[in-house]
UniProtKB/Swiss-Prot annotation:
SUPFAM superfamilies hit by this protein: Photosystem I subunits PsaA/PsaB (SSF81558)
Binding residue positions for divinyl chlorophyll a B1: 662
Subunit structure: The PsaA/B heterodimer binds the P700 divinyl chlorophyll special pair and subsequent electron acceptors. PSI consists of a core antenna complex that captures photons, and an electron transfer chain that converts photonic excitation into a charge separation. The cyanobacterial PSI reaction center is composed of one copy each of PsaA,B,C,D,E,F,I,J,K,L,M and X, and forms trimeric complexes.
The protein's Enzyme Commission number: 1.97.1.12
Catalytic activity: reduced [plastocyanin] + hnu + oxidized [2Fe-2S]-[ferredoxin] = oxidized [plastocyanin] + reduced [2Fe-2S]-[ferredoxin]
Protein name per its UniProtKB record: Photosystem I P700 chlorophyll a apoprotein A2
Domain of life: Bacteria
Entries under InterPro entries matching the protein: PSI_PsaA/B (IPR001280), PSI_PsaA/B_CS (IPR020586), PSI_PsaA/B_sf (IPR036408), PSI_PsaB (IPR006244)
UniProt keyword list: 4Fe-4S, Chlorophyll, Chromophore, Electron transport, Iron, Iron-sulfur, Magnesium, Membrane, Metal-binding, Oxidoreductase, Photosynthesis, Photosystem I, Thylakoid, Transmembrane, Transmembrane helix, Transport
Record-annotated disulphide pairs: none
PANTHER family: OUTER MEMBRANE PROTEIN, OMPA-RELATED, PHOTOSYSTEM I P700 CHLOROPHYLL A APOPROTEIN A1-RELATED
């Protein structure tokens, strides 16, 4: 038996070429393809990896806590969170000369330091942390937690503690556990922390390990809870002139429904946040008691899905609704790829919403005034959402190749989707062309007339429908008089009749960037449709890749070729680029394109509002040269001056990263615009030269060098393209924002 890598594939381990190494790495996590893998073993291995994942997260969190406690300035930040720039960690670098050492000695530090743009300081401050000692304690706790979950991962691989396949496939038990215990209890536990620690700290009352059992979070204690007088917990909220972190203007309420932002911290009211978490927690605990499990009460998922059926005797829609769902329960419950696809899609949407809401409804005290952090967090979460969404479709496609059973799904809703794929794909194609030609056409028209000195001839379209939606939520500036912007509407009367004070109208109608609905005009209308083009094109490529995964008119037996194949054999020209993997690979370029437009839009619009110069976005955002000149070029200028012959400033590391990001990005094209034959010939030439150079022959190789496969080379190209893209734009966002606002 071969002992070479990879041990999980003995056939590959005996491959005499370097293909062994690259294919081994490529399939290391494709547990399904490993030698001797059974379904039960597969589930057990995956379950164990979850604990490893949790350990990595815990160690990462511990590292952040430890370095800030050791090298940061958290206690100074607590004293003045709007002016003290948070320090991520110190820098030790032997290359640092006097100039850069001086430039990077910032934020009151004694030596070179990195500034934190993660928002962690604001989060720790908001949840009631105040000292470095507390950060150290949290770091130690997270390190212990990491060890504990690593042990749990190892334990669940031992014969006595391996869960059975039946346990993994008990969908109802799994749903109940995740809903009630993981979501429900954790939300209620977090409410407990907010009520017992964070809210008292925000009112100047310290709660620690020494007194947390003796300090009542509310003067009335639990009496209102047991007497069902829950409204007592909402009475006497913090006043509008409360100073965050002190007793000045503080109330006693713990669960409120105030809406809007705390006037001083410019974040959501902590008592509103606590109310949100207790409500969510209760909803999830109830949801986790809905499915039939140990006691035989509750819903069966199989019965629920199969009742969605026009042939069902109790169908209330008399055959007009609910195509057969027979087989859907088995299909989802037996396919890890289907489940992963659903999970990734859900998480992708949630992550994108987090990006939006961190800016529109900031929940951490004073974070809204840290413009660089806000820009970094928005960009970070939108990029993550993009990766998750593409991953969702990738695993959807793998499901169709590996797990889909036409017999189980005969004539059900999934089979109907496959059966109508031509209509779905062609409609998406039509939408992308309509969006692309019209949006680009208007942009280019506007460029031409501006270039020829007639800016008044631009086509400028007011987004009236979007403005109406904003007005319906209470935005007054458009004069639409709809729902909440109409003082006589039933919505306004209902809102005004609610007891107590409420501040969401103040938030919506703010004049600064903190308004939850920023004013919009023709520039927003155009970029909105550009983003819609990116979304629909990415979706088109992904959906086509998944729905065509099993076969097409061109390649009817595609499912037998697998998820990733370069071409359909040497005898069939014109079949390259047709595997589902290729569709996901091609979609990544559009996804990166799209997410750049999304983040460009958010960043430029906010930069102009923060600078008090919104007219720049409104006027320059209606034509392409305006975007290139007044957003990209203008905001790159500080960056490219991070270092020059006359010296350096604190932006120089970002300037270098900006340059390096371009290099990594451009390197991607070397792999993307070449095929395997070129590299194979080059390698053979280098081998020839090596063998004819006496001194070089002192070094040999066990594996015969061969070029990467077509698919692997594409992956290498895409990886460089993606990482370069992110390095470049990340450096641009942070440097262009911090260069203006610190």
């Amino acid at each position: 038996m071969a002992t070479k890598f990879p041990s999980f594939n003995q056939g590959l381990a005996q491959d005499p070429t370097t293909r062994r190494i690259w294919y081994g790495i490529a399939t290391a996590h494709d547990f399904e393809s490993h030698d001797g893998m059974t379904e039960e073993k597969l589930y057990q291995k995956l379950f164990s990896t979850h604990f490893g994942h949790l350990a990595i997260i815990a160690l990462w969190v511990a590292g952040n806590l430890f370095h800030v406690a050791w090298q940061g300035n958290f206690e100074q930040f607590v004293l003045d969170p709007t002016h003290v720039r948070p320090i991520a960690h110190a820098i030790w670098d032997p290359h640092f000369g006097e100039g850069i050492t001086e430039a990077m000695t910032q934020a009151g530090a004694n030596g070179p330091v990195n500034i934190a743009y993660s928002g962690l300081y604001h989060w720790w401050y908001t949840i009631g942390m105040r000292t470095n000692e507390q950060l150290f304690q949290a770091s130690i706790f997270m390190s212990i937690l990491a060890c504990w979950v690593l042990f749990a991962g190892w334990l669940h691989l031992q014969p006595k503690f391996r869960p059975t396949l039946a346990w993994f496939k008990n969908a109802e038990a799994q749903l109940n556990h995740h809903l009630s215990v993981l979501f429900g209890f954790s939300s209620i536990a977090w409410t407990g922390h907010l009520v017992h620690v964070a809210i008292p700290e925000s009112r100047g009352q310290h709660v620690g390990w020494d007194n947390w059992l003796t300090v009542l979070p509310h003067p009335a204690g639990l009496a209102p809870f047991f007497t069902l007088n829950w409204g007592a917990y909402a009475q006497n909220p913090d006043s509008l002139d409360q100073v965050f972190g002190t007793a000045e203007g503080a109330g006693t309420a713990i669960f409120t429904f105030l809406g809007g932002l705390h006037p001083q911290s410019e974040a959501l009211w902590l008592t509103d946040i606590a109310h949100h978490h207790i409500a969510i927690g209760c909803v999830f605990v109830i949801a986790g008691h809905m499915y039939r499990n140990t006691f035989g009460i509750g819903h069966s998922l199989k019965e629920i899905t199969e009742a969605h059926n026009t042939r069902h005797p109790n169908d209330p829609h008399k055959g007009s609704f609910g195509i057969s769902h027979d087989g859907i329960y088995e299909t989802v419950n037996n396919s890890l790829h289907f489940q992963l696809g659903l999970a990734l899609a859900s998480l992708g949407v949630a992550t994108s919403l987090v990006a939006q809401h961190m800016g529109a409804l900031p929940s951490y005290a004073f974070i809204a005034r840290d413009y660089t952090t806000q820009s970094a967090l928005y960009t970070h979460h939108q990029y993550i959402a993009m990766f998750l969404m593409v991953g969702a479709f990738a695993h959807g496609a793998i499901f169709f190749v590996r797990d889909y059973d036409p017999e189980v799904n005969k004539d059900n809703v999934l089979a109907r989707v496959l059966g109508t794929k031509e209509a779905l794909i062609s409609h998406l194609s039509w939408v992308t062309m309509l969006l692309g030609f019209h949006t680009l056409g208007i942009y280019v028209h506007n460029d031409v007339v501006v270039a020829f000195g007639n800016p008044e001839k631009q086509i400028l379209i007011e987004p009236v429908f979007a403005q109406f939606v904003q007005a319906a939520q209470g935005k007054m500036m458009y004069g639409f008089d709809a729902l909440l912007s109409d003082p006589t509407s039933s919505a306004t009367i209902a809102a005004n009749s609610m007891p107590g004070n409420h501040y969401w109208m103040d938030l919506i109608n703010r004049q600064d960037a903190l308004s939850s609905f920023l004013p919009i005009g023709p520039a927003d209308f155009l970029v909105h449709h550009a983003i819609a083009l990116g979304l629909h094109t990415t979706a088109l490529i992904l959906i086509k890749g998944a729905l065509d995964a099993r076969g097409t008119k061109l390649i009817p037996d595609k499912k037998d070729l697998g998820y990733a194949f370069p071409c359909d054999g040497p005898g069939r020209g014109g079949t390259c680029d047709s595997s589902s993997w290729d569709a996901m690979y091609l979609a990544m370029f559009w996804a990166l394109n799209l997410i750049a437009w999304v983040t460009f839009y958010w960043h430029w619009k906010h930069l102009t509002i923060w600078q008090g110069n919104m007219a720049q976005f409104n006027e320059s955002g209606t034509y392409l040269m305006g975007w290139f000149r007044d957003y990209l070029w203008l905001n790159s200028s500080q960056l490219i001056n991070g270092y020059n012959p006359f010296g350096v400033n604190s932006l120089s590391p970002w300037a270098w990263m900006f340059l390096f990001g371009h290099l990594v990005w451009a390197t991607g094209f070397m792999f993307l615009i070449s095929w395997r034959g070129y590299w194979q010939e080059l390698i053979e030439t280098l081998v020839w030269a090596h063998q004819r150079t006496p001194i070089a022959n002192l070094v040999g190789w066990r594996d015969k060098p061969v070029a990467l496969s077509i698919v692997q080379a594409r992956l290498v190209g895409l990886a460089h393209f993606t990482i370069g893209n992110i390095l470049t734009f990340g450096a641009f966002v942070i440097a262009s924002t911090s260069g203006k606002f610190g």
